Amino acid sequence: MVVLTGHTLTLEEVKRVLYRDELVIASKESMEAVERSRKAVEEIVANKNVVYGINTGFGKFSDVLIAAGDVEELQWNLIHSHACGVGEPFPEEVSRAMLLLRANALLKGYSGVRPIVIERLLDLLNAKIHPVIPQQGSLGASGDLAPLSHLALALLGEGEVFYRGKRVPAIEALSAEGIAPITLKAKEGLALINGTQAMTAMGVVVYLEAEQLAYESEAIAAMTIEGLRGIIDAFDEHVHLVRGYRQQVEVAARIRDYLAGSKLTTRQGELRVQDAYSLRCIPQVHGASWQVLDYVKEKLEIEINAATDNPLIFEGGAKVISGGNFHGQPIAFAMDFMKIAIAELANISERRIERLVNPQLNDLPPFLSPAPGLQSGAMIMQYTAASLVSENKTFAHPASVDSIPSSANQEDHVSMGTIASRHAYAILQNTRRVLAIELICAMQAVEYRGVENMAPKTRKLYEAVRNIVPSITKDRIFSKDIEATAQWLKGVDWPFFLQTITPTNQYS
């Protein structure tokens, strides 16, 4: 069970909720803070104090005073008018993360919602009712207005949701679970949609999956080293300690661990003096990507516990301040940085694929073909990898350097953070497929070398994937193999699978 406080949520807890469907509840203390904040809003309405978003219009309409009798209609209008998202929906795990993160943000007690609003968010989460939320339409300031409006619709029993494997009207799923829709009161519509939870939710999913893929990329690279009879000396601890980057040292340690006991690796001067960079510099390149992952993790763990609403209510209502915590610039920067880190794992992987299939660079059959000439073998797999890598370079263009004014220039600088997160997710999918191709090629290469000569850990990886992708004995439709391998990489419980050495403070 994960207990939300608004302050202590971790990425490990988010992972358990997203991928293991762990039950989520709100702490008693946080709900008490929510109640105090709500009383402040009700007093503002009763006393007819003018406060943005409670009894005024929104954006450029912030100077329009709303009559007391129209305050609830204001919130209803807000959600419906702002539900302007278009395009394909976010993956279900992202929608699920948005429910979790919005509930956690509201539990900080600075937003002025009733406890029932948070309870409904958690009801949907625990019942696995995931709002259908279009991916396109957010500028990343004033928060993720359009995506979160589609989330809010589900609380009202409107819009569509994913439920039990189907896309159905929200009211149908709520009725099936005995969950009553809510009616929004003063400020609650704004509190639901004024935040960074779309970009952050997708960012969290990208981080969690990229972390696993980074580990996997090292084991795949280790098998490639075996397939190419690579030189193990380049991974000696002394080399990496003198540079001083913890992540680089740890990657080298994991490569040594994966290759322990291998009869396929070589020593300096045995076959050649040194390897190409795509083999020799694995710790330096992969380690640099880990540095970015660590940076992104730090930013995400702040943002998943952040108050990103506007206005914010302090000191029991004594202070109600309009600020800009909804601005997604920190996450936009983090996701743009993440795009580069993930893309680079694909870049170096594609170069290793080339070394596996190019007969001018190895002593293996051309393109790993069982009958070169008659059969093309892995030739076009390298084309696919090159295409995916090239597409990644387009996606890696920073979204955060762009800004288009909106709301009649009231919102004159925006983050485009959700675009950055979406592109990071696209790069992640491409990179996983590139690594799947490398794994397929590496498995074929070690077969030519003799599987019995592999290290125990790389052989375990080989045997697991051979259960879903057979050896290349003749040409076939390799697209299915690539997708099956990519799905396996996404779904396997990696640290336990190969007892991967995880980061420590040994080299801090």
UniProtKB/Swiss-Prot annotation:
Please report the organism this UniProt entry assigns to the protein: Geobacillus sp. (strain WCH70)
Keyword Nucleotide-binding annotated: no
Provide the cross-link position: 5-imidazolinone (Ala-Gly): A141-G143
Q: Name one GO molecular function term.
A: histidine ammonia-lyase activity
Note the PANTHER family from the entry. Answer: HISTIDINE AMMONIA-LYASE
Give UniProt keywords alphabetically: Cytoplasm, Histidine metabolism, Lyase
Q: Per the similarity annotation, which family is this? A: Belongs to the PAL/histidase family.
The UniProt entry's GO biological process terms, in alphabetical order, are:
L-histidine catabolic process to glutamate and formamide; L-histidine catabolic process to glutamate and formate
Q: What is its EC number?
A: 4.3.1.3
Q: Which InterPro entries does this chain map to?
A: Aromatic_Lyase, Fumarase/histidase_N, HutH, L-Aspartase-like, Phe/His_NH3-lyase_AS
Its recorded reaction(s) are: L-histidine = trans-urocanate + NH4(+)
PTM characteristics? Contains an active site 4-methylidene-imidazol-5-one (MIO), which is formed autocatalytically by cyclization and dehydration of residues Ala-Ser-Gly.
User: What is the protein name stated in its UniProt record?
Assistant: Histidine ammonia-lyase
Q: Which Pfam families match?
A: Lyase_aromatic
Establish whether keyword Cytoplasm is in the entry.
Answer: yes
Q: Which pathway does it serve?
A: Amino-acid degradation; L-histidine degradation into L-glutamate; N-formimidoyl-L-glutamate from L-histidine: step 1/3
> A Gene Ontology CC term for this entry?
cytoplasm
PROSITE patterns, per this entry?
PAL_HISTIDASE
